Amino acid sequence: MLLHIKQVLTSEELREARGILADAPWGDGRITAGSQSAHAKNNEQLREDCEETRALQQLLLRGLERHQLFFSAALPKQISPPLFNRYGGASNSFGNHVDSAVRFLRDGSGRVRTDISCTLFLAGPDEYDGGELVIEDTFGVQRVKLPAGDMVLYPGTSVHRVLPVTRGYRTASYFWIQSMVRSDEQRRLLFEMDNHLRHLRSQYGETDSGVIGLTSTYHNLLRMWLDV
């Protein structure tokens, strides 16, 4: 499932993030790449342990906490600490690759199975040319270039790439989610059911017998498929 989530960050939060990024210490993005993706990766990245990264992580996670759509779609069990990258100039692209199945946390606190990959755009599409995120999966080939503050979720199993940036700079955050429901197909079905339930609640109310019955079915399926 590929999902566009709008306005994860407010305009005020975006201004704050851009202010932090303006003075951030960018370095070679290959330091976090796996053995295969290191050959394809040509971008810049903030160090995981720098003050700017920590401030941006708190800002982004606060934004995620507000979004019911995000929780409905991802059913997150664990979210890896968000990282931040930049494409432009001589460091302007990332060739075809698949994310590693497991992300080991830098502080040694554990690991995250990368069920879902996430990219949150911090630069608007008018600020750079090129830089589309191209994702290949069962839904076909999708080219993604979103407004600043918007985010895309897609399966961690997808082959994807970032096309060369030929003008300006493309800044973004990226991170991974270990979901309580491992299967992408099962998550999609639960997400669709949850969307339909919200519509039915708005039409018929919480006490309608059909709404209660479908809510029970949703939670029974969730209980069956949960990996906690």
Swiss-Prot record:
Its EC number is 1.14.11.-. The keyword Transit peptide does not apply. It is an enzyme of class 1 (oxidoreductase). Fe cation binds at H97, D99, H160. GO terms for biological process: DNA damage response; intracellular iron ion homeostasis. Residues 78-179 form the Fe2OG dioxygenase domain. PANTHER family: PKHD-TYPE HYDROXYLASE YBIX. Binds 1 Fe(2+) ion per subunit. Its cofactor is Fe(2+); L-ascorbate. Gene3D superfamilies: q2cbj1_9rhob like domain (2.60.120.620), Rabenosyn, Rab binding domain (4.10.860.20). The keyword Ribonucleoprotein does not apply. It holds the Pfam family PKHD_C. Disulfide bonds: none annotated. Keywords: Dioxygenase, Iron, Metal-binding, Oxidoreductase, Vitamin C. SMART domains: P4Hc. 2-oxoglutarate binds at R170. This is PKHD-type hydroxylase Vapar_1809. GO terms for molecular function: 2-oxoglutarate-dependent dioxygenase activity; iron ion binding; L-ascorbic acid binding.
